[in-house]
Design a protein with these regions (language model features):
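Hot-dog-fold acyl-thioester-processing enzymes
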Residues: 1-50, 104-121
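HotDog/MaoC-like acyl-thioester-processing domains
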Residues: 1-5, 56, 61-62, 73-121
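Short alpha-helix capping/helix-loop boundary micro-motifs
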Residues: 51-55
Length: 121
């Protein structure tokens, strides 16, 4: 898995317990995974179709640097599936894991369309 993007945890990223808000990290994951999918398919015409179980393993606090790892795990006819791991940059401890995030390529009418890619993207 390659870790590409990093974020510094700031006070506005926290929940009332002063730890990283789950909704915030999910927003970042969806954005980072979408960028990864767009780059793999060479098209911005994608949508998030599904996410498998979201496993919150640990948390982060103000000042932590987290990084997002993405890996291509499956290529379908109109879709690709990505695995994601968010971890603490310094300790390498996993914070959130998602085994499958599915993106679908859409045509100009918003319908799924074959992307013509293989596992060797």
């Amino acid at each position: 898995m390659k870790y590409r993007t990093r974020k510094l945890i700031k006070p506005e990223d926290l929940n009332p317990r002063k730890t990283l808000f789950g909704g915030r990290v999910l927003q970042w994951i969806d954005e980072e995974a979408a960028i990864f999918a767009i780059c793999q398919l060479n098209s911005p015409n994608i949508v998030t179709k599904a996410m498998s179980a979201i496993n919150f393993v640990s948390t982060a606090v103000v000042g932590d640097i987290i990084e997002f790892g993405m890996d291509l795990v499956k290529v379908g006819n109109t879709s690709i599936t990505i695995a994601c791991d968010v971890r603490n940059k310094i300790t390498k401890q996993s914070i959130v894991r998602i085994d499958e995030i599915v993106f679908v390529l859409l045509d100009e009418n918003g319908k799924p369309t074959p992307h013509g890619k293989s596992k060797n993207i």
